[in-house]
From Swiss-Prot:
One of its GO terms (cellular component) is nuclear membrane. Belongs to the NDC1 family. One of its GO terms (biological process) is nuclear pore organization. Residues 542-602 form a coiled coil. The gene is NDC1. This is Nucleoporin NDC1. It is found in: Nucleus, Nuclear pore complex; Nucleus membrane.
Length: 646
């Protein structure tokens, strides 16, 4: 008996590819560091000003350390998918207490501090940035300019860390392998080639420069505002305490009267800010571009060189880690679109432990798409009612009750309206006062007396009614207060506003992360394999599942369309400010269009064989409506392309 072929895990092929991409991003950081080191060179010697083993190389190594911190941070925190939450304040509450938040802020602050030390060491002596200055009689004085520059760069690092967390820079925007206009364009490997990614990085350089300049100006304004208000006295005392044992400094810790905000100082701070911001932005851009290359190697799928390519691919598709599963699904979509040999291998792979390869791929893709429906059901499901505890009699037995049983009314039920309660009390009090006399109520009243009593009571109630018409509850009061003073403001109400875009992403893509490319590639892969089976499935195993595939895609497409486009997701009461782009979610729209396009491909290819697939005319008509097709195709009586399985 032949030995079973070892199935290598999918990560054995993905990890080397990712490591090569990490190395390429590191080279970009090194080139950026060497370029900035050249900018700070004094060019007093034609050799040592640029030679890597001289002072320039030492500065480049330290600058490289500042950039590599960002790469290490990205490696430890990268994730596919967008963060899904109903409001920004919900995102803040969920992610702010985590260790990764402190790690991000500390990484950028440490990188900025190291950069400030290197930059101060390269500033010319006549710039006035030495730590100790000497005036008359050789008396040493502490210079505030380097203190402000270092503080500014550290604050800029914290500011960049906050922007990093707010913009979710750690997210990887994975691609898709959808056919364009129904045609399958062959994958040549250019999307995953290093030269293509470097060309894209080069095209991003002007944007990186503009972004660095803009953020540097914002950071300088922030530092100039916070430094004298919060940090100046403390930092001055700390520096005086540390340097007084080394220099003959004054005993007083009072800072100078003038702030170090001269034009030359601010220009130096701005130049240093642009350099360090450029290093950070270049590192982040290179990492984001290079890591999301297509799962191809030399124009072939990553698992092409495996001993068991289908088994390794299945291992990735079944992996519980979202990043590995997304890359494996992306590779499957490429196979369904561009690689007929691998498609035939999937159709002909029958002797697997858990069933044929096609059956497992079909189930995995449909389970992935069913997640969308499950997410919608979970989001729209009403909260479970609170369970009432059993009565004490069931546990202690029947005993004689000595008091009235407890009330079972809802304790949080609203009180009767002020209007009805007031009217009832006034009416009863007025009638009792009228009927009561010195000797008690009379036995009866005359008709005239009754009419007079009724008219007086009505006039009194009408006069008191305007004061008791409006019912005010605490919830309605605070809601009106929030709508009037907080949510109506575009800036103040932003953290609490639950926009339709955010709620759509949470409802459809799930939480805490939702990766649209996973669902797009799943729909593209299963539909592409089904359509290709007409020519490449020699045994006709795929056609057994075509009818159920059409029904599942029809049901899912109808549910998504009803929820997203037909009012299934209403407008939240906090969404009171009309902002452009907040009404639609691009990621959800991409998923909806992918499901619709997959259904269109399958129904166009298999509608002529609907009778043999046991699809009714109603099912075909419904599928065409969901897919957006109009004209019907005549059903063929003879189907030589298909193999009927009885």
């Amino acid at each position: 008996m032949a030995a079973a072929v070892r199935r290598s895990p999918y990560k054995d092929f993905l990890q080397p590819a990712l490591q090569r991409r990490f190395a390429t991003a590191t080279l970009v950081v090194l080139a950026t560091a060497y370029f900035e080191a050249l900018l700070l060179a004094r060019w007093s010697s034609w050799l040592w000003s640029w030679f890597p083993l001289g002072p320039t190389g030492f500065r480049a190594a330290l600058f490289f350390l500042c950039g590599i911190f960002v790469i290490i941070l990205r490696i430890s925190q990268y994730h596919p998918g967008i963060r899904t939450s109903d409001s920004p304040i919900a995102t803040l509450v969920r992610y702010a207490p985590r260790w990764t938040t402190f790690e991000t802020l500390f990484t950028y602050a440490l990188s900025a501090w190291i950069f400030s030390l290197v930059y101060l060491g390269t500033v010319p002596d006549d710039a006035g940035f030495e730590r100790i200055t000497y005036f008359t009689y050789d008396r040493a004085r502490l210079n505030e300019k380097p203190i402000f520059l270092t503080t500014h760069l550290v604050l800029l690092g914290i500011y960049q860390g906050v922007r990093h967390l707010y913009s979710d820079i750690d997210r990887l925007s994975l691609g898709t392998a959808q056919p364009s206009n129904g045609d399958s364009s062959k994958a040549t490997g250019e999307d995953g080639h290093v030269s293509t990614q470097m060309r894209r990085f080069r095209d991003q350089l002007p944007k990186i420069v503009v972004h660095s300049l803009h953020q540097s100006v914002m950071g300088l304004l922030l530092s100039a505002s916070l430094y004298p208000l919060l940090l100046r006295d403390l930092l001055w005392r700390v520096n005086m305490t540390m340097l007084r044992p080394l220099y003959s400094l004054p005993r007083t810790n009072v800072p100078p009267a003038n702030l170090p905000y001269s034009p030359s100082t601010l220009l130096r701070c701005l130049a240093a800010s642009v350099m360090v911001m450029f290093a950070w932005t270049a590192a982040n851009t290179a990492f984001s571009l290079l890591l999301v290359k297509s799962p191809l190697k030399n124009g072939k799928p990553l698992t092409a060189d495996a001993k068991d390519p289908n088994g390794s691919l299945l291992n990735g598709l079944k992996n519980k880690k979202l990043s590995i599963k997304c890359f494996a699904m992306w590779e499957l979509a490429y196979i369904a679109r561009d690689f007929p040999d691998r498609r035939k291998a999937i159709f002909e792979d029958m002797d697997r432990k858990d069933g044929p390869m096609w059956s497992q791929v079909y189930k995995i893709c449909l389970d992935t798409l069913h997640t969308l429906s499950s997410n919608i059901d979970a989001y729209t499901a009403p909260p479970a009612p609170a369970t009432t505890p059993q009565q004490a009699e069931t546990a202690l037995g029947d005993k004689p009750r000595t008091s009235a049983p407890p009330k079972e009314d809802h304790i949080f039920a609203p009180l009767p309206s002020n209007k009805s309660a007031f009217r009832t009390s006034v009416s009863s009090a007025f009638q009792n006062a009228a009927l009561a006399g010195p000797g008690g109520p009379p036995a009866s009243l005359s008709p005239v007396a009754k009419r007079t009593l009724h008219a007086a009571r009505s006039r009194l109630l009408e006069a008191a009614a305007p004061n008791a018409e409006i019912e005010v509850t605490p919830s309605s009061f605070f809601r009106e207060l929030a709508l009037k003073y907080v949510l109506s403001s575009p800036l103040a109400g932003y953290p609490f506003r639950q926009t339709r875009r955010r709620r759509l992403a949470s409802a459809v893509l799930g939480s805490p992360y939702g990766e649209p490319s996973l669902y797009v590639n799943a729909a593209s892969a299963v539909s592409g394999l089904a359509v290709s089976s007409l020519r490449e499935d020699r045994y006709g195993h795929v056609q057994r599942d075509v009818a159920s595939l059409i029904r599942e895609l029809t049901s899912l497409g109808e549910k998504l369309n009803a929820f997203v486009n037909e009012g299934g997701m209403g407008k939240h009461w906090t969404d009171v400010v009309e902002l452009e782009g907040e009404d639609k979610c691009e990621e959800v729209e991409e998923v909806v269009n992918a499901v619709k396009h997959a259904l269109k491909r399958v129904i166009v290819a298999f509608e002529p064989y609907a009778r043999d697939l046991r699809l009714t005319r109603g099912e075909v008509k419904k599928a065409r409506e969901v897919a957006g097709l109009e004209q019907e195709v005549e059903v063929r009586e003879v189907m030589p392309e298909m193999v009927q399985i009885r």
